[in-house]
Amino acid sequence: YKHSDQAKPGFDYDVVSNESLRLDGASTVNLLLGAMRYLLNPDDAIARAQLSYEFAKLYEPERPFTDVFAVTNHSFFESNLPLEFTKDKGSLKKLPLFELTETLISIFKLGEHPGEIAYLLAFQNLVLEFYSRERNDLGAFLEWWEENKGKKSVQVSGEVNAVQILTIHKAKGLQFKYVIIPF
């Protein structure tokens, strides 16, 4: 609606919901996780497909799906990824978990996506928290992530200049200047 002919100048149409702030919905976070899964098990076709898909979604959205999912051919698959990632797989896998995360962000240039920076920072905080509380193990982190990914989101202040979409259960007890209840 924001970009339609019916949008009125001077009005903001930004919307925020709990689901839109979840880390598992961020493209950059999913690319990081795909790269981590691939480093953990390069022979896993699903890990290769996920990495290929997430990379194409961010950097090559016009690329045909037949090319994106042609992951059985290792050389073709790796030719589409950054050279620094493909040639240093062995040394990347040996890095401590937090350092691996930062290195992958740098290799894939994920910090260049301004709308995703809050998600990356929140994900890095989770990695650091896991690293300091649990252990420095990529496999354990990925397992923990699968169990907890739906609970992790970017925290925003109440001063966000956007319409907040809440369920009645989440909104119970809260006060807002304006409330819209659809029927």
Where are these regions (language model features)?
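A generic short alpha-helical patch detector that favors 3-5-residue windows
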Residues: D24, L92-P96, G115
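Core structural elements
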Residues: Y1, L92-F108
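Charged/polar, low-hydrophobicity segments characteristic of intrinsically disordered regions
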Residues: E62-N80, S153-A162
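Residue-level marker of regulatory loop/turn positions in helix-turn-helix DNA-binding domains and
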Residues: K89, K93, E112, S157
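Metal-dependent DNA phosphodiester-chemistry modules and their immediately adjacent helices/loops
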Residues: N30-H74
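Conserved motor-region signature of P-loop NTPase helicases/translocases
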Residues: Y1-R48, S106-G111, A118-K151, Q155-I180
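Charge-patterned, long linear interaction tracts outside catalytic cores
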Residues: V71-E99
